[in-house]
């Protein structure tokens, strides 16, 4: 839907969404969650992956996929030489039911460009095929991988958007409950913090 932009002393003019935002809106508007079938969900997942692979600006960046304990993962790095003393562990969004490595490229690229830091993205298992705590277990596996590489907990920025923000928070709580060191920082973008969807911001 076109937005309206107003100028002082003038008539409103239509402000159209950028092509990428139109595609993103279309992908996430394929079907209402209440009526989404398994086929609809698979279609949305494939579309997200294709959109992410198409949209991520990779100039000056290197995308390095690898396997992490049976789970797909990838590094986003600057192409030029740089110090690797700190790292970002990025948890993608998607309502715990969609999203993946291809879709992760968009924000991983932005994070690397903005900070100069390497970003580790991982393809955690999705619901409904893999219910809780599968995603948390995969998040901890990614965290443990960074520790095995020699990063200290305080060297890690734990980042996530939407459901990925929830995953980042739950991972922190799990680390704390186990008496382990917590990350140096949290970077949460519109995190899903109300899993019951009963808060005033949703019901008021």
Model-derived features with residue positions:
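A glycine/proline-hinged amphipathic helix-loop "lid/cap" segment
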Residues: 1-81
């Amino acid at each position: 839907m076109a937005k309206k932009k107003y100028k002082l002393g003038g008539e409103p003019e239509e402000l159209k969404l950028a092509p990428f935002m139109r595609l993103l809106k279309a992908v996430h508007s394929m079907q209402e969650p209440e009526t989404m079938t398994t086929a609809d969900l698979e279609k949305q997942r494939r579309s997200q992956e294709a959109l992410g692979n198409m949209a991520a600006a990779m100039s000056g960046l290197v995308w390095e996929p690898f396997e992490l304990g049976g789970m797909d993962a990838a590094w986003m790095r600057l192409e030029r030489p740089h110090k690797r003393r700190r790292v970002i562990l990025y948890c993608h969004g998607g309502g715990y039911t969609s999203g993946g490595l291809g879709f992760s490229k968009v924000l991983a690229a932005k994070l690397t460009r903005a900070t100069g830091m390497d970003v580790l993205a991982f393809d955690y298992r999705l619901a409904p095929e893999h219910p809780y705590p599968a995603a948390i277990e995969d998040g901890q596996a990614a965290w443990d991988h960074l520790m095995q590489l020699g990063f200290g907990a305080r060297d890690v920025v734990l980042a996530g958007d939407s459901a990925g923000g929830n995953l980042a928070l739950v991972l922190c709580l799990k680390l704390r409950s186990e008496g382990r060191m917590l990350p140096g920082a949290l970077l949460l973008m519109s995190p899903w913090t109300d899993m019951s969807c009963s808060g005033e911001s949703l019901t008021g």
